[in-house]
Amino acid sequence: DNTRITAKWIESELGEENIGYRSRVTFIGDKGKDYRIIEVESPGESLAEEVLLVVSNFSSPDSSPGANYNASSVSMFLGLARYFVNTKNARTIRFVACPSRFPDPDSGSILSTSYIAEKCKREKEKLVGVVEIGSLGFFSEEPNSQSFPNNFDIDFPTTANFIALIGSQSSHQSMNSFISGFTKSSNIPVQKVSLNDEEISAFDGLSVFTEKGYPVIRVSDTG
């Protein structure tokens, strides 16, 4: 189906004949080889055992065409992978592309990010941070173009001309580092959203990492 086709395309784009990485593929799902998680790395040097994880999911819900959901995430993901290929960095940067969920015979479906977080914890990897790339395709200077669910007490601007960083309170330092670097090269405003444990639980893709003790932030257009 389209999810498998997309996974193969991303694997090809990241590969040695295109961007230049050697891809590592994990097959997941109740039939063994139904869904793919694609990983590539830019190896670190002095602190190579410390890993910054950059995650994008490439599947869309049935109610949302891909261009309206995560096509922008995949585009940013590939752009970052291309930027960092063959660069020298103290820490290892690992790029992971995955479907949002994959089928499980016991629970019905499992979040791919949950699988990734469990694997990192099991293998005792030293994740210094996780960046989850959300949708980034919307930008507007129109008044009242930004809204947010009423059950969150977040004071967002009403004009959707900014990048949102959403994370747990334990990700405070990671978000500040991101903002410091981003604002040196871009004039786009950045809104920092620090959520408590109860609020972060509403964001499945984030909470699976915070529950394992990993600092995580989501980069998004409107949150």
Residue spans for each PLM region:
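Soluble extramembrane regions of membrane proteins in the secretory/endomembrane system
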Residues: 11, 39, 50, 143, ...
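Surface-exposed patches in mature extracellular/periplasmic domains of secreted proteins
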Residues: 2-4, 21-29, 89-93, 188-199
